[in-house]
Every structure is written in structure tokens, then in C-alpha cells.
């Protein structure tokens, strides 16, 4: 298992998943990646690939909209908001915009961001009030980001990876990766409201003892 999961590896896996339209290939690629991770990073990665910043049962949100993303990208790269808008219109995706301008703004890239740091940023954004403060937090991490790290960090904050991977396919990948029944994975995820914990339990073959959690809607 990988001791420290990098956002770059997550992003490269996401790119491979996006490059195929075949569901079996998508789940195989994701399953191979998930098997390499430690339990904490497995939980993070499963949530993120399902498009969740937090567990489904967790009511927290980052409240990071387009204005914060635009301002942070501008501050991190030196491009003005006026430069960014026509690029966004052309590309149609804030993550693709991030990748393009980071690549142009930096002469060299050294991917260093981890999934732990990604989770920390998401938590801090949720806890922080005010557009300026949120922008500063995001800018600081974007300044360290490679084009691919920036692309998927922004996609995650925007709420959609857009790689053709819905939650049911993530459940399927978990089931295949850890040799569990898909029905058991899906049922546990429904009861737990956390696909990350579901993935960890699937690895441990501990899906049958899951109980519904009170006050967490199914």
C-alpha cells in the first residue's frame, strides 16, 4: 500500500478513467488505484471519485463558487480575471481552465500535494467565512499545484469531476477491487452515508455488520 497518496496520482488515474467510455475499463482502472492506498487515503479517494467533498451524510459544504475559484486562479497564476473569462467560455470547465493557465504560468512543475492536504483544504474552506479568506486558502495551494493537480483540485471544489464516473461505478470498482458483492457494497453505502468508509469496510470484508446510522438520511 502507498504510504502517502499524492493528488497527482489521483489526477492521473482520473485522466485515464476519463479517456475511456467503457464502464468495465473505468472500474478496473479505479479498482487498481484504490487497492494501492492506505485505509485513510482509500476513504478520501473513494469520496472524491464519487464527487463528494465530504461523506454524503456530512452536511458541511465548502461554499466555494465561481468567484472564489476565479479570484484564486488569478492570484496564483498572475492572469487577470479578464484574461480568464474568455478561456473559460472556450474550455467550458473550471478544471480545464486551471490546468491551462497553470501550465502557461509555470516553467517547471514538482507535484507535491497529497490527499491529506486536499482534505485539509476542504475542511478549512468549510470552516472559514468570507470570500477573501477562502480565496487566500485556495490560492496558497494552487501556487504549489502542477497543471494536473490544479485541474482536479478545482474540479473537486466545483462539485463534478466530469470523467464519466457516477457513484454506482465507484461502488462497482470497490466491490471488484476487494472481492465483495456489489449488492453488499451498495447497501452498506446507503446505510453509512459514506462511500469512503464503505470502501475501507469492503477491504476488511466488514460489510455485513453495518447498521443504519440515526439522524443520517438514507
Each model region followed by its residue ranges:
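N-terminal nucleic-acid-engaging modules of covalent nucleotidyltransferase systems
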Residues: 1-218
Amino acid at each position: 500500500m502507498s504510504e502517502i497518496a499524492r493528488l497527482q496520482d489521483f489526477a492521473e488515474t482520473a485522466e485515464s478513467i476519463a479517456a475511456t467510455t467503457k464502464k468495465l475499463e473505468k472500474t478496473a482502472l479505479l479498482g487498481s488505484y484504490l487497492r494501492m492506498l492506505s485505509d485513510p487515503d482509500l476513504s478520501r479517494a473513494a469520496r472524491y471519485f464519487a464527487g463528494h467533498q465530504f461523506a454524503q451524510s456530512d452536511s458541511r459544504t465548502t461554499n466555494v463558487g465561481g468567484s472564489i475559484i476565479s479570484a484564486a486562479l488569478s492570484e496564483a497564476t498572475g492572469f487577470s480575471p479578464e484574461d480568464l473569462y474568455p478561456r473559460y467560455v472556450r474550455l467550458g470547465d473550471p478544471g480545464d481552465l486551471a490546468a491551462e493557465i497553470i501550465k502557461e504560468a509555470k516553467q517547471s512543475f514538482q507535484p507535491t500535494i497529497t490527499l491529506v492536504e486536499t482534505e485539509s483544504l476542504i475542511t478549512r474552506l468549510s470552516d472559514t467565512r468570507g470570500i477573501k479568506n477562502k480565496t487566500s486558502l485556495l490560492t496558497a495551494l494552487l501556487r504549489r499545484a502542477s497543471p494536473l493537480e490544479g485541474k482536479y483540485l478545482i474540479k473537486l471544489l466545483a462539485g463534478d469531476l466530469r470523467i464519466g464516473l457516477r457513484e454506482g461505478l465507484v461502488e462497482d470498482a470497490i466491490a471488484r477491487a476487494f472481492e465483495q458483492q456489489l449488492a453488499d457494497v451498495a447497501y452498506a453505502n446507503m446505510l453509512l452515508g459514506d462511500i469512503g468508509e464503505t470502501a475501507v469496510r469492503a477491504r476488511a470484508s466488514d460489510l455485513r455488520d453495518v447498521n443504519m446510522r440515526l439522524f443520517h438520511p438514507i
